[in-house]
UniProtKB/Swiss-Prot annotation:
Catalytic activity: 2 (2R)-3-phosphoglycerate + 2 H(+) = D-ribulose 1,5-bisphosphate + CO2 + H2O; D-ribulose 1,5-bisphosphate + O2 = 2-phosphoglycolate + (2R)-3-phosphoglycerate + 2 H(+)
Protein name: Ribulose bisphosphate carboxylase large chain
Quaternary organization: Heterohexadecamer of 8 large chains and 8 small chains.
Cofactor(s) of this protein: Mg(2+)
Major site of localization recorded for this protein: plastid
Keywords noted in UniProt: Calvin cycle, Carbon dioxide fixation, Chloroplast, Lyase, Magnesium, Metal-binding, Monooxygenase, Oxidoreductase, Photorespiration, Photosynthesis, Plastid
UniProt-listed Pfam families: RuBisCO_large (PF00016), RuBisCO_large_N (PF02788)
GO-annotated cellular components: chloroplast
Family: Belongs to the RuBisCO large chain family. Type I subfamily.
Alphabetical list of Gene3D superfamilies matching this protein: Ribulose bisphosphate carboxylase, large subunit, C-terminal domain (3.20.20.110), RuBisCO large subunit, N-terminal domain (3.30.70.150)
Length: 488
């Protein structure tokens, strides 16, 4: 016999409580939840408002970043809400921070559109960061399952392919950013590129805010830059390049500029992080289809990545960008002018380069994660570095990195070409010493001094910048308790 409307409503009311119910009670907190291999996992640093229970705050993050709204709704009965609710399954107090908590949250894979960074982030960071019950919130780490990773293309080239193109193995790539950032004419800009490449660099690059300003329109820049690249390649017999920034106001214009870069012979283009995740993925697809290397400048990242209690940790950006398919990304120098704790920066580099991540709490890596054969993204070290730091750069950053000396090349008293030569000789000397088995880290200053005996430009660099360092306390360091078994 068919049930009446009144009877059906009575049964629904019996199994469904209306009104405002605590998130933890609604199912967004489940300490017994068994994490599935297919779950997307997120670790948040939660700072509840005074008087807010940390478990309820963590459940609220899970709810507001998945299926919840501020009150119970009837439509939940029309979905598999028990499946689609994100589950906060573990809450730990942050060591030495009594008002902060690490909240581990699991998301069912079906909550996310395949191959879309925009959709992934719309849930994970879309609305919850403005939640009033939280004083602050930071996304510290994520685990992306293999099934979801396989819906992304990843980098088109990666380290191995780029080395094969340049015929350069066993040492870092060497480059420089054209300075000043703004104001040069196209012809002078091209001359800077030529001088740097002629002096021994592999690449030069545009800076993040060089697009198409009145003093230098993009098409003229591209033509003069490629003239410099071709002349330097012919003079040195080496494969050279320059990162041409195609960032623009619209996707149509970026495609237009990228096509022009390819037409004039460039092997690499550049974009800025500020263009957004969808635009980044779109340009990555274009670069793959057109056999171009894609360099990403992380312009704007410190607005949300630097502060320890609120925003997004840069290691998460590294994961998203490797998924999106960029071939290069700026990832810190340790010794330069920009933010970068040595151990945390190592975690960034490992995230970009390793085929599989293990838990490493000092580096801020909270999850194991297999990269499902996605190619590596090459880290770029840029900002306040010079030849006298070469041994430290090799120690901290290894071989698979692009070392970008902007002021450390163009600020040389004897000219741009001399600055480039100084950096090239310094790099070759330190790499040779390492390969010969010398203690290149502790002997680094002596090794550079020996090399400078036969290289005047290097001696000038060492004399000029010998006292320059940026020794400031990092604002972002790892939070963990050292134990014999819990840390790597």
């Amino acid at each position: 016999m068919a049930q009446s409307v009144q009877e059906r409503t009575r049964l629904k009311n019996k199994r469904y409580e209306s009104g405002v119910i605590p998130y933890a009670k609604m199912g967004y907190w489940d300490p017994n939840y068994v994490v599935k291999d297919t779950d997307i996992l997120a670790l948040f640093r939660v700072t509840p408002q005074p008087g807010v229970d940390p478990i309820e705050a963590s459940a609220a993050v899970a709810g507001e970043s998945s299926t919840a709204t501020w009150t119970v709704i009837w439509c939940d009965l029309l979905t598999a809400c028990d499946v689609y609710r994100a589950k906060a399954y573990r809450v730990d107090q942050v060591p030495n921070s009594p008002d902060q908590y690490f909240a581990y949250i699991a998301y069912d894979l079906d909550l996310f559109e395949e191959g879309s960074i925009a959709n992934l982030t719309a849930s994970i960071i879309g609305n919850v960061f403005g939640f009033k019950a939280l004083a602050a919130l930071r996304l510290e780490d994520m685990r992306i399952p293999i099934g979801y990773l396989k819906t992304f293309q990843g980098p088109a080239t990666g380290v191995v392919v780029e080395r094969e193109r340049l015929n350069m193995f066993g040492k870092p790539f060497l480059g420089a950013t054209v300075k000043p950032k703004l104001g040069l004419s196209s012809k002078n800009y091209g001359r800077v590129v030529y001088e740097g490449l002629k002096g021994g660099l592999n690449f030069l690059k545009d800076d993040e805010n060089i697009n198409s300003q009145p003093f230098m329109r993009w098409r003229e820049r591209f033509l003069y830059v490629m003239e410099g690249v071709n002349r330097a390649s012919a003079a040195t017999g080496e494969i050279k390049g320059s990162y041409l920034n195609v960032t623009a106001a619209t996707m149509e214009e970026m495609y237009n500029r990228a096509a022009c870069a390819k037409e004039v012979g460039s092997i690499i283009i550049m974009i800025d992080l500020v263009i957004g995740y969808t635009a980044i993925q779109s340009m990555a697809i274009w670069a793959r289809e057109n056999n171009m290397i894609l360099h990403l400048h992380r312009a704007g990242n410190s607005t949300y990545a630097r502060q320890k209690n609120h925003g997004i940790n840069f290691r998460v950006i590294c994961k998203w960008m490797r998924m999106a398919g960029v071939d290069h990304i700026h990832a810190g120098t340790v010794v330069g002018k920009l933010e970068g704790d040595p151990i945390i920066v190592k975690g960034f580099y490992n995230t970009l380069l390793l085929p599989k991540l293990d838990v490493n709490l000092p580096q801020g890596l909270f999850f194991e994660m297999d990269w499902a054969s996605l190619r590596k993204t090459v880290p770029v070290a840029s900002g306040g570095i010079h030849a006298g730091q070469m041994h430290l750069l090799l120690k901290y950053l290894g071989d698979d990195v692009v070392l970008q000396f902007g002021g450390g090349t163009l600020g040389h008293p004897d000219g741009i070409q001399a600055g480039a030569t100084a950096n090239r000789v310094a790099l070759e000397a330190i790499v040779l010493a390492r390969n010969e088995g010398r203690d290149y880290v502790n002997e680094g200053p002596q090794i550079l001094k020996e090399a400078a005996r036969t290289c005047g430009p290097l001696q000038t660099s060492l004399d000029l910048w010998k006292d320059i360092s940026f020794n400031f306390t990092s604002t972002d360091t790892a939070d963990f308790v050292e134990t014999p078994t819990a840390n790597v």
